A protein has these predicted regions:
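Glycine/threonine-rich flexible loop motifs
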Residues: 17-27, 93-97, 569-579
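Extended, domain-scale alpha-helical bundle/helix-rich regions
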Residues: 482-485, 491-498
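Short Gly/Thr/Asp-enriched flexible loops that form oxyanion-binding sites at enzyme active sites
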Residues: 91-109
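ATP-dependent carboxylate activation and anion-phosphoryl transfer catalytic cores
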Residues: 2, 6, 12, 25, ...
Length: 624
């Protein structure tokens, strides 16, 4: 461990905003937990009163002040910390840390940056330095030029040739970014981008390529491995925060996956990152060509997703690594004993964003390289069909799955497919039902045929269910397969009985038939520790794809179930996660077994350490 680390300053992320939400409450809480375990005094700077990390007992001292250079310097002057953690408060903390470093404030007070150095952070944040650094090891980046004036920007765009991509340095959630087909569009976007950042990057457009992400961790002894691989359902051109994301990767073969994994470890080593980082690639499967789009040398939204997807506590381990521990040393502590081992998944997860665009009159529903989504969900299952259907129900906007959403209809399908909006996934369903081929849809959307083929399976099975007129006529094998493919009782009732109204009676008829045939979901564990003792874990999900329970229910013990609030949305955010966490903690203190049901990967409530059992699944009558 870093010598003489008696007091450490942790920079939080401040107010929630698009591109920076509850995931940093989760990562910051994990970092503070790691410090407490080491007996290190922690000082937190975060003005967000709705977070878990600012609650009593998490940090030793909390300053509800802005995360800015002026205020943080005053806190450093008063508290005299030995070290500072910058990677757990998102872009806000990273930018503040970079300013503290460049202004000499950290050196002035003898504060050591723990984990990844500020120099390495600057390599990833300054687009020009980033490209030059990766060129040293012959890693491909988009043809680009960093500029700081409109005159240079126009010259760069003309040299590269339209269409071009514009990105802002030190920006959050793709702010000020976009693809420009011509100079008129470019002038408008570049002017807007310079309002957010003094430097922008003009680069070749790779729109339509696959977007692949890796979460990688490295310690000071240079042990490095991939914790999770993730694939964006939507092609490049749509921000990863706006895209459906699936883990593990689905459409890559073993050779392609191995190549990108090896490039990831090569990249993190050359940049000198110590801790966790997220690497994003553009990938062309037709040519095996790639570009490194971005590296985040900090905990991110994708890090929280990877942690919940795999059960590997990335933020906790990253904090320990920042303190100087190696991954094998963390493993020997038994917290967790998986720190030295890459997680193995026998299931799929799917992240789906939630938008609240209808609350703002005149706002464009088109999605692209800048984030508009305000929340997200994560579904877990044994097939893509299952997780996409579960996930679309979890969003909480009245959808019943991929099919069966009678209130959604599109007049111009070609436009809806080629110019994506927040409803494009439902346009895919209508297109398939209207006879569009997978080849035609791929041409319009550039979504990989692997995903489209799985979605077509759902549409085809809807037609199979619609051939029955009575619930009691559905054979057991047909009903079971429908559940395996993620169909809810409501969907089955709609396709078989075609009723009007709220369908409560028909829904119960399907439920009764299913139970009569013994078609019930199994409770399965996620192996959070990748060890010889998976039966010890309490991270659970439900699926119809396999038989048998991995848990025994509490029989002679009192227990309390806490229902989480699901995806963040306007009017329901991290404050309800605070309520959920405090509820399970209070239940535990009173001697009850605490059970949490929630499906938001950004939250502290979906950390399996917070309760006796975590069910990462739907909040619905069918799951009750």
């Amino acid at each position: 461990m870093e010598k003489e680390m008696k007091k450490v300053l942790v920079l939080g992320s401040g107010a929630l905003k698009i591109g920076q939400a509850g995931e940093f409450d989760y990562s910051g809480s994990q970092a503070l937990k790691a410090l407490k375990e080491e007996g290190i005094n922690s000082v937190l700077v975060n003005p967000n009163i709705a977070t878990i990390q600012t609650s009593e007992g998490i940090a030793d001292k909390v300053y509800f002040l802005p995360v800015t250079t002026y205020f943080v310097e005053e806190i450093i002057k008063k508290e005299r910390p030995d070290g500072i953690l910058l990677a757990f408060g998102g872009q806000t903390a990273l930018n503040c840390g970079a300013e503290l470093y460049t202004q000499g404030i950290l050196d002035k007070y003898g504060v050591k940056v723990l984990g990844t150095s500020v120099e390495a952070i600057m390599y990833t944040e300054d687009r020009d330095l980033f490209v030059k650094k990766l060129n040293e090891i012959d890693m491909k980046t988009p043809v680009s030029q960093a500029v700081e004036s409109m005159e240079d920007a126009i010259a760069a765009a003309r040299r590269i040739g339209y269409p071009v991509m514009v990105r802002s340095a030190y920006a959050l959630g793709g702010l000020g970014s976009g693809i420009c087909a011509n100079e008129e569009e470019f002038l408008k976007l570049a002017e807007s981008s310079f309002a957010f950042s003094k430097q922008i990057l003009v680069e070749e457009s790779l729109k339509g390529w696959k977007e692949i992400e890796f979460e990688v961790i490295r310690d000071a002894n240079d042990h490095c491995f991939t914790v999770a691989s993730m694939e964006n359902f939507d092609p490049l051109g749509i921000h990863t925060g706006e895209s459906i994301v699936v883990a593990p990767t689905c459409s890559l073969d073993d050779k392609e996956l191995k190549m990108l994994q090896e490039l990831s470890t090569k990249c993190i080593r050359h940049l000198g990152i110590v801790g966790e980082c997220n690497i994003q690639y553009a990938f062309n499967s037709d040519t095996d060509d790639y570009r490194v789009i971005e590296v985040n040398a900090r905990l991110s939204r994708s890090s929280a997703l990877a942690s919940k997807a795999t059960g590997y506590p990335l933020a906790f381990v990253a904090a320990k690594v920042a303190l100087g521990y190696t991954l094998d040393q963390i493993g020997e502590m038994g917290t967790p004993n998986s720190a030295y081992v890459a997680p193995q998944l026998d299931y799929y997860i799917c992240k789906i964003p939630r938008w609240d665009l209808t609350k703002f009159a005149g706002v464009s529903r088109e999605i692209g390289s800048s984030m508009k989504s305000v929340g997200e969900i994560m579904s877990i299952g044994r097939s893509f069909e299952e997780i996409i259907q579960k996930g679309l129900r979890m969003i909480g906007q009245g959808m019943h799955g991929f099919v069966g959403n009678d209130d959604v209809h599109f007049e111009d399908l070609d436009k809806e497919l080629s110019h994506p909006t927040d409803l494009r996934v439902f346009a895919l369903a209508q297109a398939m039902e209207d006879g569009y081929t997978i080849e035609r849809i791929h041409e319009l959307t550039k979504i990989d045929p692997w995903f489209l083929g799985k979605l077509k399976n759902i549409v085809d099975y809807k037609a199979k269910l619609s051939a029955y007129d009575k619930v009691e006529d559905i054979p057991a094998d047909v009903l079971r397969e429908a559940k395996v493919l993620g169909f809810s009782d409501f969907q089955i009732a709609r396709f078989v009985l075609n009723p009007a109204g709220n369908m409560e009676k028909e829904n119960l008829m399907v439920r009764a038939r299913r139970k009569e045939l013994g078609i019930l979901p199994a409770v399965k564990r996620i192996n959070t520790i990748a060890s010889e003792h998976p039966e010890l874990t309490n991270y659970l999900y439900m699926t119809y794809a396999v038989q048998g329970y991995d848990v025994n229910y509490y029989k002679n013990e009192k227990s309390v179930v806490v229902l989480g609030s699901g995806a963040y949305r306007i009017g329901s955010s991290v404050e309800f996660d605070w309520c959920s966490v405090n509820a399970v903690q209070t239940a535990r203190k009173l001697g009850y077994k605490s059970i949490m049901i929630n499906y938001n990967p950004e939250t502290v409530s979906t950390d399996y350490d917070m309760c006796d059992r975590l069910y990462f699944d739907e909040l619905s009558f069918e799951r009750g």
